[in-house]
């Protein structure tokens, strides 16, 4: 009788442990319950104001020109790189300034050609 009782208790314990493990799996998969654990590993978002940018700008050392968009240190303003070079082309204007324009799926140098046409009033 004692062996049957021990066997039954062990069986119940085994089932309860398996059920608990299953629920923990589903909680983690579908975002339920385990929020506290996830928050510990999640990076914090940057501030919604300009304090993060201002702090980095103030701490950047540059003896020449500090580009406001990328915080790159260059010799003259029109040498500033584009913020997103994978999707932007840099076009230097004749007055010593430069602009970054979206590549927009155009073929190579097509964006620069369109800027020139627009400056001439042809576009």
Swiss-Prot record:
S-S pairs: none
Annotated TM spans: none
N-terminal signal peptide: 1-21
UniProt xrefs under InterPro entries: LCL2 (IPR034543)
Top-level taxon: Eukaryota
A biological process term (GO) from this entry: ERAD pathway
Family: Belongs to the LCL2 family.
Listed name of the protein: Long chronological lifespan protein 2
Organism of provenance: Paracoccidioides lutzii (strain ATCC MYA-826 / Pb01) (Paracoccidioides brasiliensis)
Lineage: Eukaryota, Fungi, Dikarya, Ascomycota, Pezizomycotina
């Amino acid at each position: 009788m004692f062996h049957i009782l021990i066997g039954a208790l062990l069986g119940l314990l085994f089932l309860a442990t398996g059920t608990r493990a299953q629920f923990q799996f589903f909680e983690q998969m579908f975002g339920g319950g385990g929020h506290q654990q996830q928050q510990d590993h999640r990076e914090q978002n940057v501030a919604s104001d300009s304090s993060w940018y201002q702090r980095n700008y103030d701490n950047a050392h540059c003896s020449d020109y500090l580009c406001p968009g990328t915080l790159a240190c260059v010799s003259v303003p029109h040498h500033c790189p584009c913020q997103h070079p994978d999707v932007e082309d840099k076009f230097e204007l004749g007055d010593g300034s430069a602009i970054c324009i979206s590549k927009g799926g155009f073929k190579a140098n097509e964006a620069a050609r369109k800027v020139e046409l627009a400056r001439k009033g042809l576009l």
